A protein has these predicted regions:
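A common structural junction motif
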Residues: 75-82
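Short S/T/G/P-rich N-terminal loop/turn motif that feeds into the first structured element of a domain
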Residues: 1-55, 60-73, 86-99
Length: 99
């Protein structure tokens, strides 16, 4: 299951895309990474739009239940104004990992 997270910026509470991105530089640690792997996360990356208009993250989870358990375990709530979009399909030029 691929999930695209997007938060228009500035958020309703005034945070910028860069603020949301930089929060994750210290928040995501080895324990969180290991927990995500154990619960079925196979990919996660986050970005701030260059123009500052939004924050984006993309994640792949083996199951919806694993994703839900991860967010509950780590008490992760949506950023103000954030939307999570579940994506279907998988077509493109190069598969994940370039294989």
């Amino acid at each position: 299951m691929w999930v695209l997270f997007t938060a228009p910026c500035p958020t309703p509470d005034g945070r910028t895309a860069r603020d949301l991105y930089e929060k994750r530089l210290t928040w995501i640690d080895d324990a969180m990474r290991e927990s995500a792997r154990e619960l079925g996360c196979t990919f996660h990356r986050a970005w701030a739009a260059v123009d500052g208009s939004a924050f984006y993250a993309l994640a792949h989870w083996r199951t919806r239940e694993g994703a839900r358990e991860f967010f509950e375990r780590w008490e992760i709530d949506a950023e103000p104004g954030e939307e999570a979009i579940v994506l279907e399909g998988d077509v493109g030029l190069v598969p994940l990992g370039g294989d």
